[in-house]
Amino acid sequence: MKPDEIRKMTKEERLRRLNELRLELIKLRMQARVGTLTNTARIRNIKRDIARILTIMREEELGISRK
């Protein structure tokens, strides 16, 4: 997910997407523990998407404007 896509979302959409990503991360971590996870890079990508969403939400709280 690109930062521009996240910035175009409403606050509610961001929160919903954040919750979806967190649930997916939990499921993938469980698969990794069991040994059924095939795409390990997916965990890293989800963690980065979560960080992007949280960063953009924090920027808006502080009034920092980006492109």
UniProtKB/Swiss-Prot annotation:
Entry keywords, A to Z: Ribonucleoprotein, Ribosomal protein
GO cellular component: cytosolic large ribosomal subunit
GO molecular function: structural constituent of ribosome
Keyword Ribosomal protein in annotation: yes
Gene3D superfamilies from the UniProt entry: 1.10.287.310
PROSITE patterns for the chain: RIBOSOMAL_L29
Chain coiled-coil ranges: none
Keyword Glycosyltransferase among UniProt keywords: no
Family statement drawn from the similarity comment of this UniProt entry: Belongs to the universal ribosomal protein uL29 family.
Protein name per Swiss-Prot or TrEMBL: Large ribosomal subunit protein uL29
Organism of this sequence: Staphylothermus marinus (strain ATCC 43588 / DSM 3639 / JCM 9404 / F1)
